Amino acid sequence: NLYQFKNMIEEAATGT
């Protein structure tokens, strides 16, 4: 799902 992928990258961005 595109939403799930977007959520994953957003979570990774938060860890930056």
Curated annotation (Swiss-Prot):
Substrates-to-products reaction catalysed: a 1,2-diacyl-sn-glycero-3-phosphocholine + H2O = a 1-acyl-sn-glycero-3-phosphocholine + a fatty acid + H(+)
Record-listed E.C. numbers: 3.1.1.4
Protein name, entry field: Phospholipase A2 BF-CT1
Tissue: Expressed by the venom gland.
Subcellular localization, as worded in the UniProt entry: Secreted
Miscellaneous section: Is not lethal to mice up to 4.7 mg/kg by intraperitoneal injection.
Key words of the record: Calcium, Hydrolase, Lipid degradation, Lipid metabolism, Metal-binding, Secreted, Toxin
Lineage of origin: Eukaryota, Metazoa, Chordata, Craniata, Vertebrata
